[in-house]
Design a protein with these regions (language model features):
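Positively charged, amphipathic and often flexible ligand-engagement surfaces
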Residues: 1-222
Length: 222
């Protein structure tokens, strides 16, 4: 984290399963207190398919205000839904996961809105392949008069996915990155499969993306 701070770049801590996330949250907050005094360096990741994350976001902002540091967050929908629900059933406790996709979408978009409302104190990365959520963030920022290049607003999509979102946001002047998973094949492939499955869950979006890819291929043939 010191290396990221000294290099002037951001470092995003990934989110894990609920039963091991608390220490990650605590570490992220401690590191933000230390490194985020002047600008966003250390980012925590919030999985908005969890029922408690919207409240956690608001409490985190209060901590940032009282501690005098920038709250930096990456917003995602979530990656471990089946595992979380299965464990809750096996151990007989209430599932920490939203009951359906609509509820996850609702809290994700609410988190995006909240971050933009507090853009002076929160640095937010909207990490989503969902066109509606990405458009919502861009429209709300424009409505608030927030420049596209504001250093507290970022977007990110996986390399090889949702290029139509990435390129249009970049063309409009927003801070956009491509997320590139790196690691052993046995770890990276399951991760990419979960992301692909998540991407296909957005009604109609995958078909639209395929059509756009075919259109671009035909354009390059000419």
């Amino acid at each position: 984290m010191k290396a990221a701070h000294d290099a002037g770049t951001g470092l995003m801590l990934d989110a894990e399963e609920t039963w091991i996330q608390d220490p990650v949250d605590e570490l992220a907050m401690e590191m933000m207190k230390h490194y985020n005094k002047e600008k966003a360096v250390v980012y925590n990741t919030l999985q908005m398919y969890r029922t408690d994350r919207l409240d956690f976001l608001k409490k985190s902002l209060e901590q940032a205000k009282s501690g005098g540091f920038v709250l930096a967050l990456k917003l995602v929908r979530g990656a471990y839904m089946e595992k979380e629900r299965r464990r809750a059933v096996e151990l007989k406790y209430k599932s920490p996961i939203q009951p359906d996709k609509a509820a996850s979408d609702r809290d994700f978009d609410a988190a995006v809105m909240y971050c933009i409302e507090n853009i002076d104190r929160i640095s937010c990365c909207v990490a989503s392949h969902n066109e509606k959520s990405s458009l919502l963030a861009a429209e709300q920022a424009a409505k608030k008069g927030i420049p596209a290049s504001n250093p507290h607003l970022h977007f990110s999509q996986l390399y090889g996915m949702s290029d139509n979102i990435t390129f249009n946001l970049a063309n409009a002047g927003y801070n956009v990155t491509k997320y590139v998973p790196y690691g052993p094949v046995k770890d990276v492939v399951p991760y990419l499969m979960r992301r692909a499955k998540e991407n296909t869950s957005v009604k109609g979006q995958s078909s639209r993306e395929l059509l756009l890819l075919k259109k671009e291929i035909n354009r390059r043939k000419i």
